[in-house]
């Protein structure tokens, strides 16, 4: 009986967390040679109509610890849902964004990019108020066993 009650509460807890899970975090790690110029370019991009209508909260962070690769900074795009992710990705072909990439190509070398589903949210759910991210990098050798 104790196992049943324990299982019930664990299932309830996991289900409640799943209801709070929503959206995606896209991260783009870059090696920036001139941080000030890159920040200015990002500010200029985000002040355009393209930037004002972009369907994600955009944040630029400097890595404090990174023994994984040569990236110095990460651009984080916090999407609320699948629709926002699709619109954001589609907007990367816009001439305004393509111009930003051309202007910053001498400043920033792309190192890595990833798309992550938000598993658990907590506290204040407004993306503007959630500017701290923890990313775990794992190498899974047997995905089928890991998924179990």
Residue ranges and their predicted role:
Residues 1-4:
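Positively charged n-region of N-terminal signal peptides that target proteins for export
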Residues 19-148:
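Short S/T/G/P-rich N-terminal loop/turn motif that feeds into the first structured element of a domain
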Residues 7-16:
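Bacterial N-terminal signal peptides
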């Amino acid at each position: 009986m104790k196992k049943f009650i324990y299982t019930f509460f664990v299932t309830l807890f996991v289900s409640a967390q799943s209801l709070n899970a929503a959206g995606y975090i896209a991260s783009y790690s870059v090696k920036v040679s001139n941080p000030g110029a890159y920040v200015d370019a990002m500010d200029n991009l985000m002040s355009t109509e393209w930037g004002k209508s972009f369907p994600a909260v955009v944040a630029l962070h400097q890595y404090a610890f990174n023994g994984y690769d040569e990236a110095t900074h990460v651009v984080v795009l916090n999407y609320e849902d699948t629709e926002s992710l699709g619109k954001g990705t589609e907007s990367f072909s816009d001439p305004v964004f393509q111009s930003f990439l051309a202007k910053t190509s001498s400043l920033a070398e792309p190192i890595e990019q990833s798309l992550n589903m938000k598993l658990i949210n907590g506290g204040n759910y407004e993306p503007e108020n959630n500017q701290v991210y923890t990313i775990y990098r794992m190498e899974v050798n047997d995905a089928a066993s890991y998924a179990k």
